[in-house]
């Protein structure tokens, strides 16, 4: 009888052990999913990782864009393909085909100004895996958290690369095109339909300015895409409609406070890039005002 009790007890223990192991393995993919690249907290300002999309300074070299981002109070920078590297090397550009030496020079300049590169785009991602891999290798080399694209047709390749490289992808929106009804990226409902059943590291690069140019309210769009915001090109525009232009935050119609509140409510941990597409030759004062607005708003909220 004692032997029978011991056998029964052993079977119970083994079942419990096996259940525990099964539970651990079931949770493993979720743990891996949550392991996507995190921007170090030291680069946070006012509760957000705020900086510039280098395209803001596309009249200048990357080195100058880095300097101007730091001068404006930014802590992070988002790269775009094709920008000249420096005044000393005007024939050298930064993109995913650049040489290792060029990439190292860019990394050194970014580190010199105590910034961190977080994103790259807007750039096309090919369906061909070998070609797509060049982009993800570049992102890994530069230590980026994400790539920004509009290549919806390459979604299967993108998802495979995201899983392999643990690098996020944000689908960007440009304004609604009256002469091209096939363009649907402006519509957050369409974008949600593209990403909702895909890896959680695939989502939206929320360009709030282009939503305003499409006569959409950014806060409403963010709510539609709740939980799938990878990054944001944050803008405040002077009016709703396709001809609108950038204004310093708080002086336009985009409801920047509402946008920040919604991003905070969603637990957003991506980068906010100022992509200021106005006053191109002398935008640093305006950009600094935008960054100061975000920093001050977050500090007042104790985020």
Spell out what each predicted region is:
Residues 7-21:
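Bacterial N-terminal signal peptides that target proteins for export
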Residues 79-105:
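Glycine-rich, proline-tolerant flexible connector loops at the mouths of alpha/beta enzymes
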Residues 22-31:
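Bacterial N-terminal signal peptides
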Residues 15, 35-54, 58-76, 191-206, ...:
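Histidine-acidic metal/acid-base catalytic patches
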Residues 55-59, 83-86, 122-127, 153-155, ...:
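Solvent-exposed loop/turn segments at secondary-structure junctions
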Residues 78, 119, 148, 170, ...:
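Conserved beta-strand positions in the central sheet of alpha/beta enzyme cores
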């Amino acid at each position: 009888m004692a032997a029978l009790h011991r056998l029964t007890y052993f079977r119970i223990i083994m079942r419990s052990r096996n259940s525990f192991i099964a539970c651990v393995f079931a949770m493993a993919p979720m743990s891996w999913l949550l392991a996507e690249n995190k921007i170090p907290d030291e680069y946070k300002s006012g509760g957000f990782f705020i900086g510039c999309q280098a395209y803001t300074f596309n009249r200048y070299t990357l080195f100058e864009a880095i300097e101007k981002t730091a001068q404006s109070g930014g802590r992070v920078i988002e790269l775009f393909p094709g920008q000249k590297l420096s005044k000393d090397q005007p024939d050298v550009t930064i993109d995913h085909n650049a040489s290792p030496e060029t990439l190292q020079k860019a990394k050194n300049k970014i580190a010199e100004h105590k910034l961190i590169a977080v994103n790259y785009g807007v750039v096309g991602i090919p369906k061909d895996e070998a070609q797509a891999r060049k982009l993800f290798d570049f992102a890994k080399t530069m230590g980026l958290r994400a790539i920004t694209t509009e290549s919806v047709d390459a979604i299967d390749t993108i998802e495979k690369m995201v899983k392999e490289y643990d690098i996020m992808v944000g689908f960007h929106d440009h304004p609604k095109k009256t002469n091209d009804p096939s363009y649907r990226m402006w519509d957050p409902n369409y974008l949600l339909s593209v990403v909702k059943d895909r890896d959680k590291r695939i989502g939206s690069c929320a360009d709030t300015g282009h939503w305003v140019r499409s006569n959409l309210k950014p806060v409403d769009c963010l709510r539609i895409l709740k939980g799938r915001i990878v990054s944001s090109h944050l803008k405040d525009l002077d009016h709703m409609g396709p001809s609108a232009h950038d204004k310093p935050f708080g002086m336009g119609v985009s409801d920047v406070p509402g946008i920040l509140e919604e991003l905070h409510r969603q637990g957003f941990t991506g980068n906010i890039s100022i992509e200021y597409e106005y006053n191109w030759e002398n935008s640093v004062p305006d950009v600094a005002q935008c960054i100061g607005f975000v920093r001050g708003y977050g500090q007042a909220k104790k985020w």
